[in-house]
Amino acid sequence: MAFIVADRVKETTATSGTGPYALGGAATGFQAFSAVASNDDVVYYAATDDTNWEVGLGTYSSNSLIRTTILSSSNSDAAVSWTSAIKDIFLTYPAEEAVIEDSSNNVSVGN
């Protein structure tokens, strides 16, 4: 198990309910989760249908992403119960997990 951070990773999903995300293939111009992650690797992700959204920590497993921890969402920070409509799902770096050091060596954390 490794913690994966990578650029330009984005797929679609038609997952409904609150279960694992079934990954539907890379969006045009992006790479698939499988290009950067192996089974049991952990990632920060965001999912959206342009109305609802969810940000969390997920575990990759054979072209699916298991919701491990929901960090924030449009559903009062709980798992979103999705309809079967197509959604975007991508790697992200959540603000609440960010630690930033500026040019004066001052450190701040996101919220």
Where would I find each of the regions flagged by the language model?
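Short, solvent-exposed secondary-structure boundary/capping segments
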Residues: 62-71
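Glycine-rich, low-complexity segments
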Residues: 1-30, 71-111
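Ser/Thr/Gly-rich low-complexity blocks that favor extended beta-strand/coil architectures
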Residues: 34-57
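Generic alpha-helical secondary structure signal
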Residues: 25, 34-37, 49, 64, ...
